[in-house]
């Protein structure tokens, strides 16, 4: 009998997306603050940062709602190798496990420190959250389109969640997003367009590479990660926000110049 491996490999030297999603989060978040629970949002950001720091080849994360999208490249240097040899099953299962374990740790820490007593909230923390993940290749020219698609989804989610916090489902039935924005402003005096950017369209965890030189002339680089709460729209000029991570050869020369000038 012939047995075949089902552990497929992604294409090397091609961008990889790992998409991490919360499972049944509509149940997990029941009783949380609406429309934007600060503890939940902080836990998602911290989890995204943790994944960035611990997943080989990760250069960017975009998180919105219960979703984290990670961008991995394995061509930054000639000797760069892919995480777990780009084995699809391994990438997805380990990313999901890492997200699940860390999220459940950090949300308890944040929640117990900052959140007011809430029976539903405590029950959710006791049960814990669970994440699933998938991994796939995208051509370089399609990566920004993917992140723009997820950002548009974030905007729709934000408008819908804000509407649901102030109106009944029957009041929102068959209402387009623009109509919901108008209802919020006219009936509740809430201007969705003036919400903080991260509440409208999510946040990114971005990497900065710092170069320095030792006395012997050797150049060393260190990575730092930070949260961008004021991300642009990933269209037009905003496309470069993503694309600069897809073409490291072009941006690395600029980083070296900056380091030398400093």
Regions found by a protein language model. Give the residues of each.
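Regulatory and interdomain segments flanking nucleotide-handling catalytic cores
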Residues: 1-262
């Amino acid at each position: 009998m012939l047995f075949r491996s089902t552990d497929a490999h992604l294409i090397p030297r091609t961008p990889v997306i790992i998409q991490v999603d919360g499972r049944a989060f509509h149940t997990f978040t029941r009783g949380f603050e609406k429309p934007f629970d600060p503890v939940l949002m902080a836990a998602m950001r911290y989890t995204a940062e943790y994944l960035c720091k611990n997943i080989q080849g990760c250069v960017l994360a975009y998180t919105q709602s219960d979703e984290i999208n990670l961008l991995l490249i394995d061509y930054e240097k000639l000797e760069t190798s892919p995480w777990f040899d780009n084995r699809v099953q391994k990438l997805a299962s380990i990313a999901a496990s890492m997200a699940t374990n860390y999220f459940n740790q950090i949300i308890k820490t944040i929640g117990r420190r900052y959140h007011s007593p809430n029976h539903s909230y405590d029950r959710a923390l006791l049960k814990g959250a669970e994440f699933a993940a998938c991994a796939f290749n995208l051509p370089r020219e399609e990566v920004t389109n993917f992140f723009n698609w997820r950002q548009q989804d974030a905007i729709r989610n934000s408008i819908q969640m804000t509407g649901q916090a102030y109106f009944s489902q029957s009041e929102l039935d068959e209402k387009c997003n623009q109509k919901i924005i108008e209802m919020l402003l006219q009936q509740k005096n809430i201007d969705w367009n003036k919400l903080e950017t991260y509440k409208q369209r999510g946040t990114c965890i971005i990497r900065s590479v710092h170069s320095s030189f030792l006395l012997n002339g050797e150049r060393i680089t260190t990575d730092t990660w930070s949260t961008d709460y004021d991300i642009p729209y990933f269209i037009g000029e905003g496309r470069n926000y993503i694309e600069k991570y897809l073409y490291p050869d072009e941006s690395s020369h600029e980083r070296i110049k900056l380091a030398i000038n400093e």
